[in-house]
Amino acid sequence: MANAYKQAGVDIEAGYEAVSRMKKHVQTTMRKEVLGGLGGFGGMFDLSKFALEEPVLVSGTDGVGTKLMLAFMADKHDTIGIDAVAMCVNDIVVQGAEPLFFLDYIACGKAEPSKIENIVKGISEGCRQAGCALIGGETAEMPGMYSTEEYDLAGFTVGIVDKKKIITGEKIEAGHVLIGLASSGIHSNGYSLVRKVLLEDGELSLERIYGRLELPLGEELLKPTKIYVKPILELLKKHEVYGMAHITGGGFIENIPRMLPEGIGAEIELGSWKIQPIFSLLQEVGNLEEKDMFNIFNMGIGMVVAVKEEDAKDVVRLLEEQGETARIIGRTIQGAGVTFNGGTAL
């Protein structure tokens, strides 16, 4: 039967080898609350040790999008898993939740053990950065659905927060200060446009260094999404945070308003932070309008935090002590949407 399945394109032995290879990486993510080991039908996590008055579970799921195609082109698969974790855990930490565990789903045309191992190695690294355990996953070999070189990757996370400490943004008022945490680069959104502008229309090479970039283009584009969990959780222990926004698809324009109550807008001070060269390259090569850039990309800011004005400098200092690059980038105002430099609302 195994031979018949292999003739149909599914290599069971390769799947077993991939699982064997990934175990050592998964083990590095374990927390004391995890029950059982890799290979069970379901992952188990003990919540009894959490001393919360009204514990609330917060879940999130996401993928990496067409950034995967850059990984295929560069044949580099050991960091794309970090992106999958980041996209999930950053989404739930903005609500004040501590990520507890993570599960992954890999669908591929052919299960190559070394490639699967590298993907899971990256996922495990992301979990370590976020402090969550990789307690399960699925690797589905689907010949005919994907080519032999292709795969898709998605992740799922669950976190916990005390109900009274959930961050909703509903208490944000005009005059609160917006602090931006620097991104590592493009992160995991907008890659369909990136490929069209830089690779298809611009015909740029992944191996070359362009403009003010410090790395070859391929390495720049595959920089992993920054995981903000640990510095944000440390911040929440010491300061009151009124709202947070993970700057993903939709950029500043779509994501900052998601944390704001009705009647409150955001005024962003352009020039208050460094916009990385990769965004300048994209805008120049693609002849893109600034409005479009801020409506698609993170433009150098991956997370925005709203705090009281009197706390702002201390919050920046704490975040910098945690290794982040943090800047005061604006404030909340009466109104709606996002305004730049007090000028045109984009």
UniProtKB/Swiss-Prot annotation:
Q: What's its top-level EC category? A: ligase
**Matching InterPro entries, A to Z?**
PurM-like_C_dom, PurM-like_C_sf, PurM-like_N, PurM-like_N_sf, PurM_cligase
* Cellular location(s): Cytoplasm
Which GO MF terms does the UniProt record name? Answer: ATP binding; phosphoribosylamine-glycine ligase activity; phosphoribosylformylglycinamidine cyclo-ligase activity
The intrachain disulfides are none
Example GO biological process term? Answer: adenine biosynthetic process
Catalysed reaction equations from the record: 2-formamido-N(1)-(5-O-phospho-beta-D-ribosyl)acetamidine + ATP = 5-amino-1-(5-phospho-beta-D-ribosyl)imidazole + ADP + phosphate + H(+)
| Key words of the record | ATP-binding, Cytoplasm, Ligase, Nucleotide-binding, Purine biosynthesis
Q: Name one GO cellular component term.
A: cytosol
A Pfam cross-reference name:
AIRS
The similarity annotation says:
Belongs to the AIR synthase family.
HAMAP family reported in the protein's UniProt record = AIRS
Quote the protein name from its UniProt record: Phosphoribosylformylglycinamidine cyclo-ligase
The species is: Bacillus cereus (strain G9842)
**Gene designation:** purM
